[in-house]
A protein has these predicted regions:
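Conserved P-loop NTP-binding catalytic core
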Residues: 34-41, 45-47, 51, 60-113, ...
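Conserved catalytic network of the ASCE P-loop NTPase/AAA+ motor domain
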Residues: 40-41, 93-95, 105-108, 281-284, ...
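Pre-Walker A-like glycine/lysine-rich segment at the N-terminus of P-loop NTPase domains
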Residues: 1-65
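C-terminal lobe/lid and adjacent interdomain/linker elements of RecA-like ASCE P-loop ATPase modules
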Residues: 1-4, 245-247, 305-394
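Extended helical coiled-coil dimerization/tether regions that scaffold
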Residues: 8, 199-265, 385-394
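Glycine-centered tight beta-turn/hairpin loop motif at sheet-sheet or coil-to-beta transitions
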Residues: 12, 106-108, 132
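Electropositive, glycine-dotted interaction segments
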Residues: 110-238
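Conserved ABC ATPase signature
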Residues: 45-49, 237-281, 289-302
């Protein structure tokens, strides 16, 4: 479970931006809250709103990039290869480092992990945990200097094998370091997502190929979404699967006839729902953090709402999955769907070109307030001022 993520100097984000999934004292929709321990309550869903080019997607991009640097394509860079730094461009100090930090729970233990880097090397890196409710250092790094709390000599050996453009959390995992294993596994097992209009079919296709209850869950959701699809068939090689959807026509004599259509002939919204439902079900089963840019992309608003309700529903989300998404859909600004502490905004300062991230709770909205109307009227910022006037939503 993710408690908080912060990012500094990444794309349009210059100063530190923070999103927090810690629940406020708001009593509404309290049944949806998830608890990593006896003292804390977290929200399962965080929605991020903002105008086009405001930088809301950059927050999600940073979180997923952090994962890629820990356990993805940037985790095993060769010596001399560049790190994927994309610093804030509108500045006289373009060489400033980028930094990420995630505070999360894995196996009932709280972790705080972060690092800073430039295009050539990791500058700082640290990991803390709270195994008995008290903060304790696991390791810290500044340049080539390391500090360790346990198994110092063994970890110094591993540190000596860690290139300057690699994270110690990544390299130590390759050598099965028990001190960093669980902190690493959160990124590897519990954090996933996609950006923009990307279609990720892997999870859905895997469930269908497994058959049985896994396929039944996919078909149940397709039927629930009223897409007219009765079955899914996959043929051809695994590398280039041919996906077909079964539709039926009822004749006047009471019989029905089935027709298989290529998935590519379905609407874009249907294809989008098909690609996402597998990831949704997998995240719910694993208790993962699912990061989704433009959640409503090409889908009917009711389908988008259904996907959010699945994570909000404690009876469905029994493994404490979380969903972080960006959207323009003001229909989701509904306090019967989301709590006030689940709604966040991104706004770009037109003078500095910096993105600011802030929560709806900073405005102390009243219970029952029409958040959608207030947002379109500019009450909370984070909207485009077309022609300089946003007062049309009266």
């Amino acid at each position: 479970m993710l408690l908080q993520f912060s990012v500094t100097n990444h794309r349009s984000i210059k100063d530190t931006a923070i999103i927090s999934l810690k629940a406020s004292t708001d009593k509404s929709l309290s049944d949806c809250l998830i608890s990593p321990d006896e003292k804390k309550q977290l929200v399962p869903v965080l929605a991020l709103y903002g105008a086009n080019a405001a930088g809301k997607s950059n927050v999600l991009h940073a979180l997923l990039l952090m994962r890629e640097m820990v356990c993805g394509r940037y985790a095993k860079l060769l010596k001399g290869e560049s790190l994927p730094q994309e610093p804030f461009a509108f500045t006289d100090q373009p060489t400033q480092p980028t930094s990420f930090e995630a505070i999360y729970f894995y196996g009932g233990i709280k972790y705080a992990y972060g690092f800073s880097f430039d295009k050539s090397k990791v500058l700082t890196e640290y990991l803390y945990h709270w195994p008995n409710g008290r903060e304790a250092l696991v390791f810290s790094r500044e340049g080539n200097g390391y500090q360790f709390r346990e198994n110092v000599q063994e970890q110094l050996t591993l540190a000596g094998r860690t290139a300057e453009n690699r994270l110690y959390l990544s390299s130590s995992n390759e050598w099965n370091c028990p001190q960093t294993e669980k902190a690493y596994l959160w990124f590897f097992e519990k954090l996933t997502g996609f950006m923009g209009t990307e279609m990720r079919l892997d999870a859905t296709l895997s469930a269908i190929r497994q058959g049985g209850s896994e396929k039944s869950r996919i078909l149940h959701e397709m039927l629930y979404a009223d897409l007219g699809i009765k079955d899914i068939r996959i043929t051809g090689p695994k590398e280039e699967p041919i996906i077909s959807a079964l539709h039926t026509l009822d004749a006047e004599d009471g019989t029905s006839k089935g027709f298989w259509l290529p998935l590519g002939q379905e609407s874009v919204g249907t294809q989008r729902f098909f690609s996402r439902i597998g990831m949704w079900l997998a995240a719910l089963e694993a208790g993962s953090v699912l990061v989704v840019d433009e959640i409503e992309s090409s889908m009917h608003p009711l389908l988008t709402r259904h996907l959010i309700e699945m994570v909000q529903d404690a009876a469905i989300n029994t493994n404490h999955a979380q969903l972080i998404f960006t959207t323009h859909d003001t229909g989701l600004l509904d306090l019967t769907l989301l709590r006030r502490d689940q709604i966040w905004f991104a706004e770009k300062n037109e003078k500095t070109m910096q993105t600011d991230i802030y929560a709806l709770t900073e405005f102390s909205p009243r219970k029952g307030e029409n958040i959608s109307k207030g947002y379109l009227q500019g009450r909370y910022g984070a909207i485009p001022f077309i022609g300089g006037d946003a007062a049309w939503a009266e």
